[in-house]
Swiss-Prot record:
This is NADH-ubiquinone oxidoreductase chain 4L. Keywords: Electron transport, Membrane, Mitochondrion, Mitochondrion inner membrane, NAD, Respiratory chain, Translocase, Transmembrane, Transmembrane helix, Transport, Ubiquinone. InterPro entries: NADH_UbQ_OxRdtase_chain4L/K (IPR001133), NUOK/Mnh_C1-like (IPR039428). Its EC number is 7.1.1.2. The lineage of its organism: Eukaryota, Metazoa, Chordata, Craniata, Vertebrata. It is found in: Mitochondrion inner membrane. One of its GO terms (molecular function) is NADH dehydrogenase (ubiquinone) activity. It comes from Pseudosoriculus fumidus. Pfam families: Oxidored_q2 (PF00420). The keyword Mitochondrion applies. It is an enzyme of class 7 (translocase).
Length: 98
């Protein structure tokens, strides 16, 4: 395993641990999720380039599309919660149910 793979794995682990530790605020959770998606994108791009697997060359693009959708939904939830309650706590998401 090369040093690049270990650094990317470590970055994913740090982002995941950040998601577990700072899960009370929605903004912190969204930043950790974006870090995880960025490391997954880099890892999939490196894997496609190293294996010369042309059929899977769309995988990083599809991953970026899902990351953009996740960011848009997360930011809209953040705006809705902060406008409604004035804070960005994740526990306020349970109060948004009809």
């Amino acid at each position: 395993m090369s040093l690049v793979h270990m650094n990317i794995g470590l970055a994913f682990t740090v982002a995941f641990l950040g998601l577990l530790m700072y899960r009370s605020h929605l903004m912190s959770s969204l930043l950790c999720l974006e870090g995880m998606m960025l490391t997954l994108f880099i890892m999939s791009s490196i894997m496609v380039l190293n294996m010369h697997f042309t059929l899977a060359s769309m995988l990083p693009i599809i991953l970026l599309v899902f990351a953009a959708c996740e960011a848009a939904v997360g930011l809209s939830l953040l705006v809705m919660v902060s406008n409604t309650y004035g804070v960005d706590y994740v526990q306020n998401l349970n109060l948004l149910q009809c």
